Amino acid sequence: GTGSFGRRFIETVLTRARPRKLIVFSRDELKQHEMQLDLAERFDPETLRCMRFFLGDVRDRERLSLAMRGVDIVIHAAALKQVPAAEYNPSECIHTNIMGAENVVRACLANQVRQVIALSTDKACNPVNLYGATKLASDKTFVAANNLSGDIGTRFAVVRYGNVVGSRGSVAPLFQRLSARGAAELPITDERMTRFWITLNQGVDF
């Protein structure tokens, strides 16, 4: 996709490999346009010949299935991840994070995709909010899909990250903005909390 992970992942693949086809599937046309412009500055036209950009939403199984034709590997990174927004809009979070995961599974099976990796979060472990609960349900959907692949042989896996430093919506950019404005204090939810951090590069390399 066109999020923090998706952009870095695409850049890494283009740098390290020569894929026959590399598809970006996301619902934000502006971010896709900006990503295309950014890639054009970083890579030569020959390297970018493999790139395809599909507008679509994981809620739309038919569009997903169309995008996955002839695809060997799928990385599923789409999610609504802002905790307060999820609590205020529970049905939207459920539709994207749970039903979207089910749509990805079915589209992958229909197209005989070889390998599927779903990105998840440590908040899915003993969840205390709706976001974590939806990601737990999503994780179980992907793991259980291994029982459905049959002779197709599609393998489904889930990787749970901690907080990714600098990703969209993470606390690091907020702290940077506040610090630049001369804030005397940085807000935290609870002084007893513990957060686990990885860099974006660590997430991609994993």
Task: Tell what function each PLM region has.
Residues S26, F54-L55, H95:
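Conserved residues in the N-terminal Rossmann fold of short-chain dehydrogenase/reductase
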Residues G1-T15:
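N-terminal Rossmann NAD(P)H-binding glycine-rich loop of SDR-like oxidoreductase domains
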Residues I73-H76, L80-K140, A144, F156:
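Conserved Rossmann-fold NAD(P)-dependent oxidoreductase catalytic core, especially the SDR/UDP-sugar
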Residues L37, E46-I73:
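Conserved Rossmann-fold cofactor-binding substructure of NAD(P)-dependent oxidoreductases
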Residues A17-E34:
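Conserved glycine-rich Rossmann-like NAD(P)H-binding loop of the short-chain dehydrogenase/reductase
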Residues D28, D38, D122:
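Residues in the short beta-alpha loop(s) of Rossmann-like NAD(P)-binding domains
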Residues L130, L136-F206:
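NAD(P)-dependent short-chain dehydrogenase/reductase
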Residues T12-K21, Q112:
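Conserved S-adenosyl-L-methionine
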